[in-house]
Amino acid sequence: MIEPKEREMHRIAVTGIIWKKEGREYKYLITKRSPHKKAWPNLWTVPGGGMEVDDYIHGETTFANSESPQWYNAVEKTLRREIKEEVNLEVSDIQYLLDVAFIRPDGVPAIVLSFYCTYAGGEVKLDEDAVEFAWITAEQVGDYELIQGIDHEIELVEERLAAK
């Protein structure tokens, strides 16, 4: 088992399962990671990435005059930024799905907060970290080599949407 380098610090990342309804089916956006990526090259995933202090520190604060300023909605701002950077889309109705904690191969503890959100506009334009994209149904997840767990997350979203 990999031991964490720091006991109190975690790398926090967010992912967004973007969905849209086409006819009677729900479709989910997945992207194929570039072969030059160190982690999970050539595997399919959903948009997301790490939180950065700049996602919130220059934004509107609550209790700005205190010794310890606070920023609300930092995770949502990160998710919107990552989706815009990676696939050039706008999203709405962001909903929490689940979280996953693990220790990366480099020893850094990580937490991924996974959300699902409605496609709200734009045309997919990939950044340099992805080489392909597809809008797929939950039934098609087995046709793609996805990063472990993404298939399960898409199935969970499908269940939640079907229950509406």
Describe each PLM feature range.
Residues S114-Y116, K125-V157:
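NUDIX/MutT-family hydrolases
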Residues R11, E90-D93, V100-E123:
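Active-site-adjacent beta-strand/loop module that shapes the phosphate/pyrophosphate-binding cleft
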Residues E82, E86-E90:
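Short alpha-helical functional segments enriched in proximate histidine and acidic residues
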Residues E25-R81:
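Conserved Nudix-box catalytic region and its N-terminal flanking loop in Nudix hydrolases
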Residues K20-R24, S34-P35, T118-E123, A138-Q140:
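Short loop segments at secondary-structure junctions
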Residues M1-G23, R33-K37:
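Acidic, metal-coordinating catalytic segment for phosphate/diphosphate chemistry
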